[in-house]
């Protein structure tokens, strides 16, 4: 059976995992890292860079480097690159394509299906957008799963015989969630969830960026935030300082030649203490506490009922965050999971549940936000309460607001406000053909259906005439089927171009290596090579050099192969002359002289070392 991968599509970093031998395993990327920056960059030559290589060149290419696109999922935000507009779904799909390719390289087989995680507090539009991104990337998204729920799966897989109530505190790069779950006998039941989709590590970075920029402006009269290259350098410095202050009480921010004016170049060289960082970000930390309170209220539990607090997301490494959660809950924090990888591992476990590889596990999730429709007076009338276990289906009968009304518009909303206008509009549709009657007489049954992905379907039926209308919610910010199809084709085109570009680099590098080794060996052999043979080899070397700067890969391959075979034959003749007894020498093969195969051997050695991982988290036995 083909493997289904689990993907944590993060704001700042993403991670991919797969089940192997009944356990979730994190798949390293092509660069050898276990997480991949969710960064996409477009180069002047049309090439796309994704992940760490894209992040590395962001300073020199800030206008065409896209970061934190997840924050715009489910909105009508567009990114304009060289007069081409890209939706958040398309940019996210590029990151997913990279994760998919890395998984295929690791597994040695094609990957077409995935489970993808989203913040628990994502609304319907954001979930649909995530599913669309998967489709554009060539993945069938079998399930959308909430990030804290995925984390609880990874935490609880080896604790199936225990009964625990856990609180998952998930502070990532751009979003924040709290979920309360009950674990017991293989059942993972979400009791309540709350959060903020606009709060994460990016906001902590921004506080530092503003502080550094304001300090510099006060001293030099220049606002660095107006310089795109300078602001990118500030972003990198802020992120680095934040990470360093998780283990040190002070760090130095040193940015030479950050800008210049009439008096000459300007530099930044300042010390930042952890105490100052805590002061700057205090309000952000405090914002994470209210969702804890609300999720407890929604679950019906008291804090004393909670057995474990699981910290998820890279931003939970911030000491002030850990201290605030400890003080607020009065409990020690469980550090038995890797905050960067646990969500992807949980997604892989859910994939295992779907394939039957993981047995005796039942996941019961909830809808994070209240669902309803607009009724007379603009009121939002609830059909499905937040924290209702999904999948679920609920119906309610409504009537007309005016005499003789023959059609009604169903305005579907999601949110906690009492007025429809204050909530998120998911969609509108019209039920026509209602028999004319005095207001209040027709009976219109509205049914909400939420699937296991948290995606909403709504139908309306006139019980008198039997007329029916329904929609799968597709908000104006979601892509149409035609737009998705177009994006899929563009993604395939990009993928083909990337593949061709990679092959071109490999073929040309191999040609360079063969030419170098041939010329070096020819020099080393000296007069052992006859003038006739030497001329023949030099002719073949010239043939490779003539074609290797072009784009005809088949011609380069053929010229390289001709050179290899020619030299192989001549070197064999030299060895035979040196050993007239007839013992066969090994023969010269340029491919084995530190070229491509040597690289492969190195890669094999690296692969053997994949199990040696530097970890910065503490493993505890939580049993």
From Swiss-Prot:
SUPFAM superfamilies in UniProt:
Actin-like ATPase domain, Heat shock protein 70kD (HSP70), C-terminal subdomain, Heat shock protein 70kD (HSP70), peptide-binding domain
- Sequence ranges of Basic and acidic residues compositional bias: 604-623
Residues bearing the modification Phosphothreonine = 175
Alphabetically ordered keywords of this record: ATP-binding, Chaperone, Nucleotide-binding, Phosphoprotein, Stress response
Provide the leader sequence positions.
none
A Pfam family that the UniProt record links to this protein: HSP70
Disulfide bonds listed in the record? none
GO molecular function annotations of the record: ATP binding; ATP-dependent protein folding chaperone; unfolded protein binding
Q: Where is this region: Disordered?
A: 580-623
Q: Where is the composition biased (Low complexity)?
A: 591-603
The protein's matches in PROSITE patterns, at most eight in alphabetical order, are given as:
HSP70_1, HSP70_2, HSP70_3
Q: Which domain of life is it from?
A: Bacteria
Induction conditions: By stress conditions e.g. heat shock.
Among its keywords, does the record have Cell inner membrane? no
Function comment: Acts as a chaperone.
* Family affiliation: Belongs to the heat shock protein 70 family.
The protein depicted here goes by the name: Chaperone protein DnaK
What would be the name of the gene that encodes this protein? Answer: dnaK
């Amino acid at each position: 059976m083909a493997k289904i991968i689990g993907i944590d599509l993060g704001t700042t970093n993403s991670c991919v995992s797969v089940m192997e031998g009944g356990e979730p395993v994190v798949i390293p990327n092509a660069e050898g890292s276990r997480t991949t920056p969710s960064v996409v960059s477009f180069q002047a030559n049309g090439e796309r860079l994704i992940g760490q290589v894209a992040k590395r060149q962001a300073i020199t290419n800030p206008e065409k480097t896209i970061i934190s696109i997840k924050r715009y999922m489910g909105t009508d935000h567009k990114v304009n690159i060289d007069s081409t507009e890209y939706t958040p779904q398309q940019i996210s799909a590029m990151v997913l394509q990279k994760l998919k390719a890395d998984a295929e390289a690791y597994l040695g087989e094609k990957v077409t299906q995935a489970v993808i995680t989203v913040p628990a507090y994502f609304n319907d539009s954001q979930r649909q957008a995530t599913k669309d991104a998967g489709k554009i990337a060539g993945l069938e998204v079998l399930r959308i799963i909430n990030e804290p729920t995925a984390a609880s799966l990874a935490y609880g897989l080896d604790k199936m015989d225990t009964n625990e109530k856990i609180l998952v505190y998930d502070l990532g790069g751009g979003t924040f969630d709290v979920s309360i779950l009950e674990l017991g006998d293989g059942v993972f039941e979400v009791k309540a969830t709350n959060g903020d989709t606009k709060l994460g590590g990016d906001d902590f970075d921004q506080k530092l960026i503003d502080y550094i920029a304001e300090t510099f402006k006060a001293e030099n009269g220049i606002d660095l935030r107006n310089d795109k290259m300078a602001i990118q350098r500030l972003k990198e410095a802020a992120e680095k300082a934040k990470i360093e202050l998780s283990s040190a009480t002070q760090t130095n921010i040193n940015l030479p030649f950050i800008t210049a004016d009439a008096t000459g170049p300007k530099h930044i060289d300042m010390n930042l203490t952890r105490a100052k960082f805590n002061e700057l970000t205090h309000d952000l930390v405090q914002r994470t506490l209210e969702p804890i309170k609300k999720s407890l209220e929604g679950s019906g539990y008291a804090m004393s009922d909670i057995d474990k607090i699981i910290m998820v997301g890279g931003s939970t490494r911030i000491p002030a965050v850990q201290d605030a959660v400890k003080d607020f809950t009065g409990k020690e924090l469980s550090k038995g999971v890797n905050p960067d990888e646990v969500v992807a591992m949980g997604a892989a476990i859910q994939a295992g549940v779907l394939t039957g590889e993981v047995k005796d596990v039942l996941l019961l999730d909830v809808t994070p936000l209240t669902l309803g429709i607009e009724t007379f007076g603009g009121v939002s009338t609830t059909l499905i309460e937040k924290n209702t276990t999904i999948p679920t289906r609920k119906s309610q009968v409504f009537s007309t607001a005016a005499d003789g009304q023959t059609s009604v518009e169903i305005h579907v909303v999601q949110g906690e406000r009492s007025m429809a206008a204050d909530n998120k509009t998911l969609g509108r549709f019209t039920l026509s053909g209602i028999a004319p009657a005095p207001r209040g007489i027709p009976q219109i049954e509205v049914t909400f259906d939420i699937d296991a992905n948290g995606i909403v379907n709504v139908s309306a039926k006139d019980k008198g005439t039997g007329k029916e209308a329904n929609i799968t919610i597709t908000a104006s910010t979601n892509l149409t089927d035609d737009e998705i199809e177009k994006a899929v084709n563009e993604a395939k085109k990009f993928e083909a171009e990337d593949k061709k570009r990679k092959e071109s680099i490999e073929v040309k590098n191999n040609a360079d290596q063969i030419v170098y080794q041939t010329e070096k060996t020819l020099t080393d052999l000296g007069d052992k090579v006859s003038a006739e043979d030497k001329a023949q080899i030099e002719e073949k070397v010239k043939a490779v050099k003539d074609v290797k700067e072009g784009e005809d890969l088949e011609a380069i391959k053929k010229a390289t192969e001709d050179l290899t075979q020619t030299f192989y034959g001549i070197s064999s003749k030299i060895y035979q002359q040196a050993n007239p007894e007839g013992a066969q020498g090994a023969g010269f093969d340029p491919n084995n002289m530190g070229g491509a195969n040597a690289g492969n051997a190195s890669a094999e050695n690296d692969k053997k070392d994949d199990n040696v991982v530097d970890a910065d988290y503490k493993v505890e036995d939580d049993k």
